[in-house]
Amino acid sequence: MFISTNEKSEIKYSRVLFKISGEALMGSKQFGHDMEAIGELSKGIVEVCNLGVQVCIVVGGGNIFRGTSASLSGCERASSDYIGMLATIINALILQNFLEKNLVASRVLSAIPMATVCEPYIRRKAIRHLEKGRVVIFAAGTGNPFFTTDTAAALRAVEMNCDVILKGTQVNGVYSADPKKNEDAVMYDRLSYTDLLTRDLKVMDASAISLARENSIPIIVFSLKGEKIVNIIKGQGTYTIVSDCKQ
């Protein structure tokens, strides 16, 4: 696809990692998958790929199974987390199919080997896929219990040398309180990593934020519903950026 010089000059990032929650795949449903919502999400990712940006994705599994919730109900935590990892593989395969319907080559790489349905995670192989213009979808989190997919996203972003972590949520940025419950909640345009930790703003868990901070990878929090993903790549639209850089 031809990319104009103006479009190239607008692109702020050359390699990005999207963190997509399982809930984002539910759409308006309470459980499972909303194929229309997944289709729209996939089209947004395709638009980013068409700009020549290298894209990798970490997908959650909360629309199918939540390990922490199950452990509170009596299921062993480690077992619950492994079940949650399997849920992320299901989501990754569905997302892969939608991307390939839009003629974007993609590969699912799982931290838990499952050779008949996806590739095992190998860092150098993942980077090679990105260099060839394929979308890489990381499944099964880190492959270890007790670590969230947020931590997996930060880890993979570091390993892939990504320019930014893009966290798509239900709201258009980071707020001082839940805007759905508190109409006085204030949205922040910019925060530092320390702000997230000290104010307990619940954007990502502490280990994910620490990994991003140690490796100077900014985190952008934006709405998957109200904002075109391609605008974020160009530095446009409404979002919160988490970084220690002042510019």
Swiss-Prot record:
UMP binds at G61, D81, T142, G143, N144, P145, F146, F147, T148, T149. Pathway: Pyrimidine metabolism; CTP biosynthesis via de novo pathway; UDP from UMP (UMPK route): step 1/1. GO terms for cellular component: cytosol. Transmembrane segments: none annotated. InterPro entries: AceGlu_kinase-like_sf, Asp/Glu/Uridylate_kinase, Uridylate_kinase, Uridylate_kinase_bac. It comes from Wolbachia pipientis wMel. NCBIfam families: pyrH_bact (TIGR02075). This is Uridylate kinase. Keywords: ATP-binding, Cytoplasm, Kinase, Nucleotide-binding, Pyrimidine biosynthesis, Transferase. Pfam families: AA_kinase (PF00696).
